[in-house]
């Protein structure tokens, strides 16, 4: 949906001069709103043991991660590079949750060395690690109606987590290996806007945790319910009631664990930063090909979600409101027909040179970018709380793109030299 009134009020007066001096396309984020959204989440759970871990995969840009760390957020990492990024920014020990899948032993060892809260996605890894983390946590696989109805796909085909039926034995095996401190992780929905469904998804994890703890004879120090809270991408979407959501989960946690209530952890990414970013681009082409086509200087390399998922992102021409409307396809320049930001979208009639804003790109936007076709990833800017615009990641260049190339091939293996 459109960026907030506060963001628009501070950004729009700057856009004309900014885009005359700084080339489009670029993502720009609202520092004030990202910080405030984190604070809102923390406040909703303020009367309970709780910590939010920002999902690095959503927006792995150091300037943003540093802001959130200073606010008391932890970082949710799922790869070695994300771990290294978190450590480079000063995150230590339980500032980091490592929740990954299809994970190599070396990656687990790296997370263990960082002192992170490690989530085992597969029980077989428990047998391979030489030393266990201080707290052993397993991820329960998505299951039930909520998981099937979310963007996570069919729960029966999920690659994530351990089937619920195997959890008790997994914890018993960890106990036999000497583990005495435990947590549990589960994420049962994705981009969920229904309060009822989001609560049900969280309660499922809490109830599974209570049953497993009882049957395995262990105590849980924390329950991590992952992310999953949605944002209103469409104009008619309604934002989830955060206070009601938090209150329902706190009640469920107390009911399931009346004594020694575990700490609640969350790994929100999209919810924290998603609404507070916009991709600023410019119209560079207009043509008719049986359909009215509007070409932007941004491509799918800057925002993959519409092409990959068919995801909706609100798109506006901020300085074209008085023109007659028409129906247009808005496209990028990749040699792929799915490089489209919008199809059959009602818009004021665009002119070449118009600015076009694609909204809600503060999560899974730049982070999912790629360089196919030599279309490089754009810059990232931030509108600071003081009203300044700062560059937090420059646009990629030809040298960046070709940096790993060996222009003169390097011999790495020659079978004729092998000793038989």
Curated annotation (Swiss-Prot):
It holds the Pfam family Orn_Arg_deC_N. Belongs to the Orn/Lys/Arg decarboxylase class-II family. This is Protein TabA. Its cofactor is pyridoxal 5'-phosphate. One of its GO terms (molecular function) is diaminopimelate decarboxylase activity. SUPFAM superfamilies: Alanine racemase C-terminal domain-like, PLP-binding barrel. InterPro entries: Ala_racemase/Decarboxylase_C, DAP_deCOOHase_LysA, De-COase2_C, De-COase2_CS, De-COase2_N, De-COase2_pyr-phos_BS, Orn/DAP/Arg_de-COase, PLP-binding_barrel.
